[in-house]
């Protein structure tokens, strides 16, 4: 966000707000998050979204109530694709990587999580609801319906 605002001389945050009506929770995702939040495990959102973009998404969806913590890669200065992100996350929010679950729509992020030692990894079959679903997310299983993976 900051980079493109500087590079293009445009208020990218304002442009994102103008398109905010396109922000929505995936079908079944809220029930999935509620079930996780009701369980004994900590639930942490990790995102590459800039804090301004994340705030807008949370304002529109209200899903922040399901998380114990919200971490933007911008907080650490490293994208989730970098091992430095996972090291910083494990220092800020100690967890056992082998027991952690990461659900992400980015295959490079999932590969990075696997390299860090995250034990449970799942992809999103259709990262962009306006585009067709992916045929392959190998080697990661793909979620196409959150209601089918309720804990």
Task: Name the predicted role of every residue range.
Residues 44:
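A short beta-strand/loop micro-motif in the catalytic core of glycosyltransferases
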Residues 1-17:
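A metal-dependent, Asp-based hydrolase signature
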Residues 13, 30, 34-37, 41, ...:
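Asp-based, Mg2+/Mn2+-dependent phosphohydrolase catalytic module
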Residues 47:
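Conserved phosphate-coupling serine/threonine residues in phosphotransfer and NTP-handling enzymes
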